[in-house]
Amino acid sequence: MIASRTLALLLMSLFNVGIAIAEDPPPDQIAAAQMMDDLMHGRGTVGGPFTLADPTGRKRSDSEFRGKLMIVYFGYTFCPDVCPADLMAITQALAELGPAARDIQPIFITVDPERDTKVLGEYVAAFHKSFIGLTGTPEEIRKVANAYKAFYAKVPGVGKGEYEIDHTGVIYLMGRDGEYLGFMPPQTGPERLTEILRQYLAK
């Protein structure tokens, strides 16, 4: 579960690259801001090219999803609460959008490749058939996470060798050309997420 210190680090990082909450939008964006009060509009460099492996070992690159909106989520399969809740919200939003959801590619990037790689395919398939789970070496994952300004760190558990991962559980939204559109905070409801996605699908 994301800790308060983690959220503070995330917000500081995003602020430093020019992320702004839509509090006082220009007049022509007022309607959008009212609909998307959970969405942070990006002005800095967040995201970028990546190549990781899917559960079959096939290399997948962000460039193959051009023409679709891309939802990017960093998490891990052992996450007890935040990840399942956010992935379920995404799943419900995709279901609500119906056929239009074909123009959205949801991607789950594990921040725990040591434990997740073997179970990643089954895990994401339990939420929505269009989800693609991606993994890689710890170094590859760290590089992509850094590009998205996503924080994560191992937290020792009770038993020997046990651990959880403290991570930023936000939902990143990327445009049809791969540009960063913004992110939704943890536990954004499916209704709000549907509204946001529907607006961008119409563009």
Regions found by a protein language model. Give the residues of each.
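Generic structural signal for well-ordered beta-strand positions
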Residues: 60-61, 181
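Structural microenvironment flanking redox-active thiols in thiol-disulfide oxidoreductases
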Residues: 85-144
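Extracytoplasmic/luminal low-complexity segments enriched in Pro/Gly and acidic/polar residues
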Residues: 197-203
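Short active-site neighborhood of thiol/selenol oxidoreductases, capturing the structured segment around
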Residues: 62-86, 90
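Thiol/disulfide oxidoreductase modules built on the thioredoxin-like
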Residues: 140-196
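N-terminal targeting signals for export/organelle localization
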Residues: 1-49, 53, 203
